[in-house]
């Protein structure tokens, strides 16, 4: 890394130049950056310096890395209003994005201790545990664990769960999400979520924990979601 005592390090100067290109619109959402080798030639520097610059931009949420494909300008964040009861697929479509949900696993298992109280269950009660990956415009943005109650949705695993769980509940069980308790806070990406999303374990993430109720006021399920730190923003209008 080239720098002169008292001067700004070269990796920060390169970061600033790339950031200016992104914020000015010269590089647009979804655009692919030149390869690391090409950037080395453009800025007449080493690959180590370029990687430091790219890491800084990634931490700022301006670019993201696709495995074996390179670096891309980060798409605009999805925005979520917690006061609006909407599902992921509807949220994406309302914002001009193409949603996709992929079921990674679905099992009947003993309720995890950390969600037992929220679901009003006893030790060794059973739940359906779904792990799913959510995409916006082909980019994996959210790793989700759905904890579903067999008493509300018996034989859930027989249905196609590669889509909206809301629609499955409505069409097969006549159950509708009507209210929820939502908490969200920054956290470190756990190993299983990191592997599914293609990011490093321990990277910044936004955790959403959503306890959902049906039209009869009963607990319906509990979702735990790990979002890429650069993919979601929370907005609330109190007017």
Swiss-Prot record:
Pfam families: GntR, UTRA. Keywords: DNA-binding, Transcription, Transcription regulation. One of its GO terms (molecular function) is DNA-binding transcription factor activity. InterPro entries: Bact_HTH_transcr_reg, Chorismate_lyase_/UTRA_dom_sf, Tscrpt_reg_HTH_GntR, Tscrpt_reg_PhnR, UTRA, WH-like_DNA-bd_sf, WH_DNA-bd_sf. One of its GO terms (biological process) is negative regulation of DNA-templated transcription. PROSITE patterns: HTH_GNTR (PS50949). Signal peptide: none annotated. Residues 8-76 form the HTH gntR-type domain. It comes from the Bacteria. Residues 36-55 bind DNA. The keyword Repressor does not apply. This is Putative transcriptional regulator of 2-aminoethylphosphonate degradation operons. It comes from Salmonella choleraesuis (strain SC-B67). The lineage of its organism: Bacteria, Pseudomonadati, Pseudomonadota, Gammaproteobacteria, Enterobacterales.
């Amino acid at each position: 890394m080239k720098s002169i005592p008292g001067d700004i390090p070269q990796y920060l100067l390169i970061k600033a130049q790339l950031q200016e290109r992104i914020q000015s619109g010269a590089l647009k959402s979804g655009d692919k950056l030149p390869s690391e080798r090409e950037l080395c030639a453009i800025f007449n520097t080493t690959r180590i310096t370029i990687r430091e610059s790219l890491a800084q931009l990634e931490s700022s949420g301006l670019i993201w890395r696709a495995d074996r494909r390179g670096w891309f300008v980060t798409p605009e964040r999805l925005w979520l209003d917690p006061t609006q009861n909407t599902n992921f697929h509807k949220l994406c479509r309302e914002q001009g994005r193409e949603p996709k949900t992929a079921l990674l696993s679905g099992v009947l298992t003993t309720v995890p201790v950390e969600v037992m109280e929220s679901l009003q269950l006893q030790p060794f009660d059973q739940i359906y545990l779904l792990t799913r990956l959510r995409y916006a415009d082909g980019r994996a943005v959210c790793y989700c664990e759905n904890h579903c109650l067999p008493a509300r949705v018996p034989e859930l695993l027989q249905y196609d769960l590669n889509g909206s769980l809301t629609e499955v509940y409505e069409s097969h069980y006549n159950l509708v999400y009507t209210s929820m308790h939502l908490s969200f806070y920054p956290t470190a990406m756990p190993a299983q979520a990191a592997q599914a999303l293609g990011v490093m374990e321990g990277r910044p993430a936004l955790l959403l924990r959503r306890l959902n109720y049906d039209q009869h006021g009963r607990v319906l399920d509990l979702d735990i979601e790990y979002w890429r730190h650069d993919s979601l923003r929370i907005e609330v209008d109190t007017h």
